[in-house]
Amino acid sequence: DKKELNIFGRYLYKGYFEEDLDIPIEVNNRLKRTHAWFVSDDDPYIEVSKHLIQQNIYIIADILSHELTHYYLYKHDKPYDDKDIEFYALTYKNGISRTESTIIENGILKYEYFKNESKCDCGFKIESYFPVIDNEFRPVLMCPKCNKPLVYNAIGAIYRDFMPGFKLKMTCDWYEREKSK
């Protein structure tokens, strides 16, 4: 519900930006093409779609944190559009998706990932997935058998369940644990 969403938003904002959130988060039942957006009016606020609040906590946190990043930069008079380097750097630092490529499949939000297969001369191979938007920030993978760098071989793009980064996952898990006390 809206009250819980605002509590969660304040928790995320405090965790990521070490400040108190001072704008409301509204639920807009008419939002269909976007999951959420930051509205920079005279009285700024964040709107989220009804279908977003029906997703799992990690998806809600990822998309809400994306909008909270817009607000944080706006509040501090910094460039806050998706294409701005300040926005890019802050979302990357915090492990938040910049702009998600998603579809809704049977009521579940799916993110687009590049699927890669990396092989080594020694016979070791591994599959990996990276968000389409952040494909240029792939880690260097090393073969655990012979310690050589693995070469990425792109297989294609697929839609699959969201895979939260470590910081986002830990933030959500901690929130859930605290809420259940």
Please name every model-derived segment.
Residues D1-Y58, K75-K181:
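Metalloprotease/metallohydrolase-associated module, dominated by Zn2+-dependent proteases
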Residues D62-K75:
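Active-site recognition of the HExxH zinc-binding catalytic motif
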